[in-house]
Amino acid sequence: MVEESELKYFVRIINTDLDGTQPVQLALTGIKGIGLHAALIIARRAGVDTRATMGLLGDEDVAAIEEQVKAYPASVPKWMVNRPVDVYSGEPKHLYGSDLSLAKEDDINLMKKMRCYRGIRHENGLKVRGQRTKATGRFGKIVGVSKRRN
């Protein structure tokens, strides 16, 4: 059994504090932009057991994981990154954390500025991806049917 003093409760990778009590694959999903599949690929390429507890890894293993996170976009096919075609550069990119949030916000603002269909739907707070809006997605005061009193 491992002593509690050896367990690091927080492991810092790519400006994100990860839960040290979780397995490596699950802990890596705490970084915005990394899902379960990407975490599995990163852990395997770093040579770390995916089921090992994150807080019990040595510094060299954490450094290897961080290197693989940085090298992830170059080591996977174009369709596996979260921005296969960047709007401005045209190159495939994989963004993490606040960079991903800012890029998504910039994309929405660009659509609003272009006044394309999706941009107009975003402006009006309506559903964007073709869902039906007659019965679901309503907002405002709820008015139900009331029973008549005798």
Curated annotation (Swiss-Prot):
It comes from Methanocorpusculum labreanum (strain ATCC 43576 / DSM 4855 / Z). SUPFAM superfamilies: S13-like H2TH domain. Located at the top of the head of the 30S subunit, it contacts several helices of the 16S rRNA. In the 70S ribosome it contacts the 23S rRNA (bridge B1a) and protein L5 of the 50S subunit (bridge B1b), connecting the 2 subunits; these bridges are implicated in subunit movement. Keywords: Ribonucleoprotein, Ribosomal protein, RNA-binding, rRNA-binding. Gene3D superfamilies: 1.10.8.50, 30s ribosomal protein s13, domain 2. GO terms for molecular function: rRNA binding; structural constituent of ribosome. The keyword NAD does not apply. The gene is rps13. Part of the 30S ribosomal subunit. Forms a loose heterodimer with protein S19. Forms two bridges to the 50S subunit in the 70S ribosome. Belongs to the universal ribosomal protein uS13 family. PROSITE patterns: RIBOSOMAL_S13_1, RIBOSOMAL_S13_2. This is Small ribosomal subunit protein uS13. One of its GO terms (biological process) is translation. GO terms for cellular component: cytosol; small ribosomal subunit.
